[in-house]
Amino acid sequence: MYALNLFDLADNDLYHRYSRRSVGAVGKHGGRVVALGRLERTVKGDPAVDPRTAMVLVERPSPQAFDAFLEDPEHEDLHPLREDGTRNYLWWTYDRMEDLRRLFGGPEPGS
């Protein structure tokens, strides 16, 4: 599964502190950062919605691994750094697909 994080940085150093520790916390539960990015431009979008300036895409082995990351008591002080170090945070999870057939109601690859 993938977790897509879109956000703006708050005017403090909390997300910087979060980022120094988060790689280990994510890795502990089998996750890995697939991509990091800063907004380059808006190609098409809803004019009523401001784009977020930062993007982090994390791959995780399962929804259970994601929940274990969120609920790990060893890192309970970590999540407030992310929450208070950002603004306008959007966070979604997506299941992994080999191609788009499942979206269209078709058979899975290899079935």
Where are these regions (language model features)?
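Short S/T/G/P-rich N-terminal loop/turn motif that feeds into the first structured element of a domain
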Residues: 1-73, 94-111
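C-terminal structural segments of small proteins and small subunits
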Residues: 79-84
